[in-house]
From Swiss-Prot:
<dbReference type="Pfam" id="PF01634">
    <property type="entry name" value="HisG"/>
</dbReference>
<protein>
    <recommendedName>
        <fullName>ATP phosphoribosyltransferase</fullName>
        <ecNumber>2.4.2.17</ecNumber>
    </recommendedName>
</protein>
<keyword id="KW-0963">Cytoplasm</keyword>
<comment type="pathway">
    <text>Amino-acid biosynthesis; L-histidine biosynthesis; L-histidine from 5-phospho-alpha-D-ribose 1-diphosphate: step 1/9.</text>
</comment>
<dbReference type="InterPro" id="IPR024893">
    <property type="entry name" value="ATP_PRibTrfase_HisG_short"/>
</dbReference>
<dbReference type="InterPro" id="IPR013820">
    <property type="entry name" value="ATP_PRibTrfase_cat"/>
</dbReference>
<comment type="similarity">
    <text>Belongs to the ATP phosphoribosyltransferase family. Short subfamily.</text>
</comment>
<keyword id="KW-0808">Transferase</keyword>
<dbReference type="GO" id="GO:0005737">
    <property type="term" value="C:cytoplasm"/>
</dbReference>
<keyword id="KW-0547">Nucleotide-binding</keyword>
<dbReference type="GO" id="GO:0005524">
    <property type="term" value="F:ATP binding"/>
</dbReference>
<comment type="subunit">
    <text>Heteromultimer composed of HisG and HisZ subunits.</text>
</comment>
<dbReference type="GO" id="GO:0003879">
    <property type="term" value="F:ATP phosphoribosyltransferase activity"/>
</dbReference>
<keyword id="KW-0067">ATP-binding</keyword>
<keyword id="KW-0028">Amino-acid biosynthesis</keyword>
<comment type="function">
    <text>Catalyzes the condensation of ATP and 5-phosphoribose 1-diphosphate to form N'-(5'-phosphoribosyl)-ATP (PR-ATP). Has a crucial role in the pathway because the rate of histidine biosynthesis seems to be controlled primarily by regulation of HisG enzymatic activity.</text>
</comment>
<dbReference type="InterPro" id="IPR001348">
    <property type="entry name" value="ATP_PRibTrfase_HisG"/>
</dbReference>
Amino acid sequence: MLRVALAKGRLLKSFIEYLQQVNQIDIATVLLNRQRQLLLTVDNIEMILVKGSDVPTYVEQGIADVGIVGSDILNGQKYNINKLLDLPFGKCHFALAAKPETSCYKKVATSYVHTATQFFNKEGMDVEVIHLNGSVELSCVVDMVDAIVDIVQTGSTLTANGLVEKKYISEINAKLITNKESYFKQSSEIERLIKQLGVSISYA
């Protein structure tokens, strides 16, 4: 039995859509019908649904053999895992966003302090970065900050709140990661999963 840790939320929705595209209907159906279950089994695969930022920890600790997680999570911290594959779904990007008339960014809110700080340092910008856990758009709408750094997929949330993308920061995509010990002990099961996903190994 191969245990796979999946990130709940946006990435899970994208993963289910991809499974349907590659005709892995059984797995997609189980995930769609999960209700509030956090542990699901299908085709010799046990799936655990966890917060995105926790996926690498479950894999690193050996609780899960494999994980599917956004590259943004992996960039924020070092983990003792194999970053095995780039996956062809879950694509979006980090961006700096603000009101259309704003051109000076002294105070910026984000849930992704590491990414934002790296970006502003690289750009040579002196910015105060404020950490928020969610609804970062609101902080800009009510003028608590000049701008936000957030994940953008379609841009509809920005538009709905009267904000526009000012600067592209970096791309995000889904990655398949493995526990280092499981990579050898369950190599055949991992290879089977990779074939089911219709992708090939290219070390990242």
